[in-house]
């Protein structure tokens, strides 16, 4: 934070702002072409778990409805020069979405990361004996 021309700072901030639109509903997929066409939108972010839920096919990532939705999203991003993004759980997942045209990834799914951290923490607590010292 330093002094300077406020108007110039706002201009620079606006140029550096990244706008990501989360696509996670059937309505989002229906409108993905219009969303991708909006000037200033940089990224289309896939909410894959929520999308399958809203499509009535929870966690069925090979279901024809989901596959068609992804194709529609990829086509819209390609047509309008937008970046595709999503969360990935592992290398296979990352490769699959890379091959589809996704280029921005959040590595690790929040619920899985939290589960891993909790499991590790509980393991430490379970290893303590009654005196509070760690068992060997």
Question: Where would I find each of the regions flagged by the language model?
Answer:
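Expand to "…catalyze enediolate/carbanion chemistry for C-C bond making/breaking, isomerization
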Residues: 1-136
